[in-house]
């Protein structure tokens, strides 16, 4: 079994079960301010899980690119990944627990698909509490498929209940599926909750059955949904009998190239192996971010900062391997080779990716020089031979200077470092980052409010108004919406004049005053394009798409949600117009209630 074969088998299986294959979305979620990147397969489907009608139907399957940033500093072990793919299938009210479980069981055990013996399967279900009953329904389905009671674990909400995000909203029990790896039990009490590695979690089926209200009451949903997820890389490692995802075809071409560049052999020395794993993970994530349709570049903010950090961390660990020259662009071909059959954007943008990596690599070499100069300046003013932890952390956080390099310089110049002090500051930083990472993983559902919906509609008016004032070359490059404001990035090479800004505001406010209706249609993508519907440049779309028309003014391919009439918006006001990156301008705007 290979990475490509597993991906194809999953898609083909669910298509045979009448699921419609939808395209995976951009790594950067559209109009979701709570997240930097899509971190789970369900995130792009949140509006549909909440009740929006999906243009492709109510039984869906796809592969979603995901990127998690909360554990970047832990990457380097055998399991943590920054970029990964999530296989997922969904029912938006079409079926529920029984059919979901039976599909999962068939895919796992059928000789045509994964061919895992059913006597190696273990499952967990929700044990119930004073608010939600025990999930005997799912357990009985598993029993009917031949899973004995002693291999069905009833676990608490911490293990087998999803949501809600925040204090209220959709939620429900889940069933997790495990495979016995054949390893010896770590103790007499070893079970599926143990982290010893005997039981591998291969799949999770979430049953969105309840709505929790503001008073903490759980009410049965009329439209129950299923959301399942299987990590592609972890599953292929299990199927190939590997102890680590890095030993699979998802990483080995990159690792082989790093071996060639560094002269090190993977598997001979753990310190070197860790460096190789970090570089392999980070270069893959960086390539996918740069290839993404969202147009992210290395910077000191948001997604750009994550990209910059991945690149610079790769360079730091390459230095530990003895690589002293530019090398990142040399790894791009290996990443593209792994994914070319499924992600053609890596092939199409390969030269661009190499150029951006080389540019950022050169910048970091200059940063290292500047960091060393700052180190010398700081140590001249110290009254002792110990560098305080806050100073070492400042070099790391403000100047992007890795701690290990500070340590090397300290040794060279005859200084010690208050490492415990540095670790204290670093842990605070990590805690903050992890909170952000948790928010990224669980976010989305919390922010589909009336205020953000109004601002989303306003971005459509803004997009069209910009084209009318500046020209048809204006194309959306990204947006970010909070309950307070919208941020809209668009293609335009010059700073807007005050007169242009005023004209755009006037056009938008006129459409609001005219009380235009907002209508949704579902049509084939080709038809939408023939009608002149605007779409995100570089984004991949399914054959059937949702198109929102603002009565005679704007027509856009969009997943929603939107208000029903522009008269709901209030007064539109541009607060700031500035450069986002080369050739890209950014507008921040608000709606003022009248």
From Swiss-Prot:
PROSITE patterns (UniProt xref)? AA_TRNA_LIGASE_II_ALA
Q: Might you give the EC number(s) for this enzyme? A: 6.1.1.7
**Any idea which positions bind Zn(2+)?**
456, 460, 558, 562
Matching InterPro entries, A to Z?
A: aa-tRNA-synth_II/BPL/LPL (IPR045864), Ala-tRNA-lgiase_IIc (IPR002318), Ala-tRNA-ligase_IIc_anticod-bd (IPR018162), Ala-tRNA-synth_IIc_core (IPR018165), Ala-tRNA-synth_IIc_N (IPR018164), Ala-tRNA_ligase (IPR050058), Ala_tRNA_ligase_euk/bac (IPR023033), Thr/Ala-tRNA-synth_IIc_edit (IPR018163)
Q: How is the cofactor bound?
A: Binds 1 zinc ion per subunit.
According to its UniProt record, where is this protein mainly located? cytoplasm
Q: Which CDD domains match?
A: AlaRS_core (cd00673)
Gene Ontology CC, one term: cytosol
What reaction does this catalyse?
A: tRNA(Ala) + L-alanine + ATP = L-alanyl-tRNA(Ala) + AMP + diphosphate
Keywords annotated in UniProt: Aminoacyl-tRNA synthetase, ATP-binding, Cytoplasm, Ligase, Metal-binding, Nucleotide-binding, Protein biosynthesis, RNA-binding, tRNA-binding, Zinc
The answer to keyword Disulfide bond applying to this record is no
Q: Which family does it belong to?
A: Belongs to the class-II aminoacyl-tRNA synthetase family.
Please quote what the entry notes about the protein's domains. Consists of two domains; the N-terminal catalytic domain (in this organism this is shorter than usual) and the editing domain; the C-terminal C-Ala domain found in most orthologs is missing. The editing domain removes incorrectly charged amino acids.
Q: Which NCBIfam families match?
A: alaS, PRK01584.1
Q: What is this protein called?
A: Alanine--tRNA ligase
Gene name, per UniProt, is alaS
């Amino acid at each position: 079994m290979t990475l490509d074969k597993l991906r194809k088998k999953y898609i083909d299986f669910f298509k045979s079960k009448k699921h419609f294959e939808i395209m995976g979305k951009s790594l950067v979620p559209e109009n979701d301010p709570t997240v930097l990147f899509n971190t789970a397969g369900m995130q792009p489907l949140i509006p549909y899980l909440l009740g929006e009608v999906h243009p492709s139907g109510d039984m869906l399957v796809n592969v979603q690119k995901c990127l998690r940033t909360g554990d970047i500093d832990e990457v380097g072990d055998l399991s943590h990944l920054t970029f990964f793919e999530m296989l997922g299938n969904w029912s938006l009210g079409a079926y529920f627990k029984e059919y979901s479980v039976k599909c999962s069981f068939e895919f796992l055990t059928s000789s045509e698909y994964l061919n895992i013996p059913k006597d190696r399967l273990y499952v967990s279900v929700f044990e119930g509490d004073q608010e939600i009953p025990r999930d005997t329904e799912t357990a009985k389905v598993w029993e009917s498929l031949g899973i004995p009671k002693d291999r069905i674990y009833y676990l608490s909400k911490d293990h087998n209940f999803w949501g809600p995000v925040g204090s209220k909203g959709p939620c429900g029990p889940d069933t997790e599926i495990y495979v016995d790896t054949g390893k010896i039990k770590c103790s007499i009490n070893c079970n599926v909750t143990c982290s010893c590695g005997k039981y591998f979690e291969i799949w999770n089926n979430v049953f969105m059955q309840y709505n929790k209200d503001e008073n903490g009451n759980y009410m049965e949903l009329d439209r129950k949904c299923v959301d399942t997820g299987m990590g592609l890389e972890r599953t292929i490692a299990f199927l190939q009998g590997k102890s680590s995802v890095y030993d699979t075809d998802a990483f080995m071409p990159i690792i082989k190239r790093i071996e060639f560049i560094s002269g090190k052999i993977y598997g001979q020395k753990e310190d070197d192996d860790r460096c190789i794993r970090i570089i392999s993970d980070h270069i893959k994530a960086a390539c996918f971010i740069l290839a993404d349709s969202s147009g992210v570049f290395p910077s000191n903010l948001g997604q750009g900062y994550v990209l910059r950090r991945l690149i610079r961390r790769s360079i730091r660990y390459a230095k530990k391997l003895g690589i002293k020259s530019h090398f990142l662009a040399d790894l791009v071909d290996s990443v593209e080779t792994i994914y070319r059959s499924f992600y053609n954007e890596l092939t199409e943008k390969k030269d661009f990716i190499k150029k951006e990596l080389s540019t950022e690599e050169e910048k970091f070499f200059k940063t290292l020089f500047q960091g060393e100069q700052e180190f010398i300046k700081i140590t001249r003013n110290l009254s002792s031979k110990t560098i305080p932890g806050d100073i070492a952390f400042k070099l790391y956080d403000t100047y992007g200077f890795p701690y290990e390099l500070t340590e090397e310089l300290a040794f060279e110049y005859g200084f010690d470092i208050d490492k415990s002090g540095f670790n204290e500051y670093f842990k605070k930083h990590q805690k903050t980052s992890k909170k952000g990472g948790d928010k990224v993983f669980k976010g989305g559902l919390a922010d589909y409010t009336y205020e953000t919906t109004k601002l989303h509609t306003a971005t459509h008016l803004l997009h069209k108004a910009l084209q009318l004032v500046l020209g048809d070359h204006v194309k959306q490059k990204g947006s970010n919406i909070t309950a307070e404001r919208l941020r809209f990035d668009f293609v335009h090479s010059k700073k807007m004049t005050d007169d242009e800004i005023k004209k755009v505001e006037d056009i938008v406010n006129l459409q609001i005053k005219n009380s235009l209706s907002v209508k949704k249609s579902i049509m084939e993508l080709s038809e939408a394009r023939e009608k002149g519907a605007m779409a995100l440049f570089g984004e991949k779309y399914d054959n059937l798409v949702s198109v929102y028309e603002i009565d005679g003014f704007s027509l856009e391919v969009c997943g929603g949600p939107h208000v029903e009439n522009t008269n709901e918006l209030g007064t539109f006001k541009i607060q700031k117009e500035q450069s986002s990156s080369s050739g890209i301008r950014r507008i921040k705007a608000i709606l003022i209630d009248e």
